[in-house]
Amino acid sequence: IIRTHYSTVDGCALAYEGVFVWREWADYIGVEDERGMAVYHNTGCVALRVEANNFLRPMCERLDIIGIPWVDWGPDKIREKLPFFDLRRFAPAKLLNDPSFGQPTGGSVEGAVYFPDAGYVNDPQLATHNVQCAVEAAGGDFRFNAEVVEIRQVDGRVAGVVLEDGTEISTSVVVNVAGPHSSRINAMAGVLEDMKISTGAMRQ
């Protein structure tokens, strides 16, 4: 899923830059992948204005700082564009075994925000393989199933990583792309306190 609305200005800016990369993905990768190339489909994205997200006001303020486009939709516009939406309110969230689960609680959604620069990549796994091909074409190397257990530092700066099998790789730069588990890598590097947000694998 590609979207531009996040909880920090930096996150929004990085995501917005990424949209333009995805639009020209094959050119960005610069090499042919025998498995084919991932394709980005720009569909736009809608988020409902509700009390739980402060009616998206803080979100839109962040987007305005960067210049990321968004469009305010009232209930009539939502019904026009997405007639299958049920705009009745069901909050607060309830468990499936709650007798009132799925029952409206009164009132209706007041509006939404449409983000035109959003969509999805048809095959995320293929996209990562595209990146692998580009890295290998540039002389890079991959080690799969090689767990990092330590990030070595000298005088407060990164000096390399240690793998589970004891292999040491010297480097002055470590890029953390561990996704939901990135906080574990940040902890190894001792930089958790520098992070504005925390990450973790979770089920929602």
Predicted segments — roles?
Residues A13-L14, A47-F55, Y114-E136, R143:
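Short beta-strand to alpha-helix junction loop
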Residues V71-G74, R143-F144, N176:
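General beta-strand structural signal in soluble alpha/beta enzymes
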Residues D165-Q204:
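Central helical "cap/lid" subdomain
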Residues I1-P99:
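Dinucleotide-binding Rossmann-like beta1-alpha1 core, especially the glycine-rich loop
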Residues L126, C133, A146-V148, V161-G166:
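Flavin (primarily FAD) cofactor-binding/catalytic cores of flavoenzymes
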Residues G30, V158, T171-S172:
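Local beta-strand N-terminus motif with an aromatic residue
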Residues D141-A159:
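A conserved short coil-to-beta-strand element within the FAD-binding core of flavoproteins
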